Amino acid sequence: MLRSHLLLVSSFAILHSSFSAQPNVIVILADDLGWSDTTLYGHTAYYQTPNVERLAKRGMTFTRAYSASPLCSPTRSALLTGQSPARTGITVPNCHVPQVVLQATTGKKAPVDQKAIQPDPVTRLKTEYRTLAETLKDAGYATAHFGKWHLGPEPYSPLQQGFDFDLPHHPGPGPAGSFVAPWKFTNFKEKSPGEHIEDRMAAEAVAWMEQTKDKPFYMNYWMFSVHAPFDAKKANIETHRGRIDPKDAQRSPTYAAMIQSMDDAIGTLLDGLDRLKLADNTIII
């Protein structure tokens, strides 16, 4: 689930008047990142996010927002379809369960300590909804999804929802096994011992952008970070362990290391855009 959502819009195209009629679009989504867990809004000194700040300085930030459902799958379905979670029926993060439910129904019961009876939710994003990926693909865009999906396995995967490419093509609620290799993804193996999933995905995303740079593209970079399981690069954990202030409410070295990997991935994407000279024609959300 996503406890809260930091929305940054970095439109290099907005800051520079020379952009094409079809700018590239990248949507970056962190998972379970608390709004106070970046340095952007001045609520933490322990968790360090220089690349989030770098992105914000090149665009716009939004500090007031309302979420119809501050959870994982509902957020993802809303981003892709423009429909509220109540309309899609995806109101809880359960799109990884085996049962295929395509129509929400009225709930019949609830625990005695619960004040309301919730509807029985949908467990897949129905392919009848027109997604942002399908719309942009029809407009001539190359489309790719990197990272967490959590809107259903085949036949409801990114490949059936308008995306040409999907990596690591994993329907689960978190990384398969762990963030640090060895992983348990079915068809996605590490290139080196101890490889971090965000490092690998960011590198693969930049490689895909390079292959696609002569065509407008829409790319989802939907991180597994910083959702459970709570593990990270050991060296980074030890670095942050040495920075703990026992009086600070934020003092988890493992979580700090997870945020660092998230931020590093954003930096890799930004560096790639600059190197490929795509930044001035790319909108990042």
Where in the sequence are the language-model features?
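Short, basic, low-complexity termini and linkers enriched in Ser/Thr/Gly/Pro
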Residues: 1-21
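Formylglycine-dependent sulfatase
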Residues: 19-285
